[in-house]
């Protein structure tokens, strides 16, 4: 099932931006583009607390603040909107990748088929997820390592398209007169 990462323009192009949200979003997208999960996974990175990318209602939402990033998990848009719950605060892009990646791997390993992260968090409790990731550094690093290991052979579909010869829409047919 697909993943998507939505970003706002962040500090690069917005006077309110406190963090470079597009850079962080690109890093997340490249890390996770071929990830399989129990259900679709939506991520968002907002460059400031104004939350233009709607990070507060995504499976994993990253919100830039003056001192780094706040990570929210378990949000859901749509008819039954669920506001994501505050998970932790980090300072670097590397920490964003590690903490959000560890959470997604925990969800991949323990989530039920067709269960969104909001229902997963409702079932196991936010405290459980925090204990596995925030309170257990070795466990977090192991979860993140398993995620990266599972994605190491993924091929970027855009890169494959760029290396092949362009496909022609119409191929001439030789006709004998």
Question: Predicted segment positions?
Answer:
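Flexible, glycine/charged-enriched surface loops at secondary-structure junctions
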Residues: 1, 37-42, 109-123, 140-150
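Small-residue-enriched alpha-helical segments and adjacent helix-cap loops
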Residues: 1-66, 163-177
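General structural feature for long, well-ordered alpha-helical segments within catalytic domains
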Residues: 4, 20-28, 92-99, 125, ...
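A glycine-rich phosphate-binding loop feature that marks nucleotide/adenosyl-phosphate handling sites
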Residues: 5-8, 44-50, 118-129, 152
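Generic secondary-structure signature for well-ordered alpha-helical cores
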Residues: 30-37, 101-113, 134-138
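Mobile "lid/hinge" segments at catalytic clefts and subdomain interfaces of large enzymes
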Residues: 42, 47, 51, 56-116, ...
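Extended hydrophobic packing segments that form well-structured cores
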Residues: 129-137, 174-177
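Charge-rich, low-complexity terminal tails
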Residues: 143-177
């Amino acid at each position: 099932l697909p993943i998507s990462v939505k970003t706002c323009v962040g500090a690069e192009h917005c006077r309110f931006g406190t963090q470079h949200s597009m850079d962080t979003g690109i890093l997340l997208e490249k890390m996770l583009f071929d990830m399989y999960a129990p259900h679709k996974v939506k991520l968002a990175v907002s460059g400031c607390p104004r939350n233009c990318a709607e990070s507060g209602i995504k499976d994993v939402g990253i919100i830039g603040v003056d001192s780094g990033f706040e990570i929210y998990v378990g949000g859901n848009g749509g008819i039954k909107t669920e506001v994501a719950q505050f998970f932790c605060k980090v300072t670097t892009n590397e920490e964003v990748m590690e903490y959000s990646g560890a959470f997604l791997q925990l969800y991949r390993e323990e989530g039920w088929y067709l269960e969104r992260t909001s229902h997963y968090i409702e079932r196991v409790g936010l405290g459980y997820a925090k204990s596995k990731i925030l309170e257990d550094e070795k466990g977090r690093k192991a979860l993140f390592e398993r995620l990266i290991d599972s994605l190491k052979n993924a091929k970027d579909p855009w890169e494959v398209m760029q290396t092949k010869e362009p496909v022609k829409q119409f191929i001439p047919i030789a006709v004998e007169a």
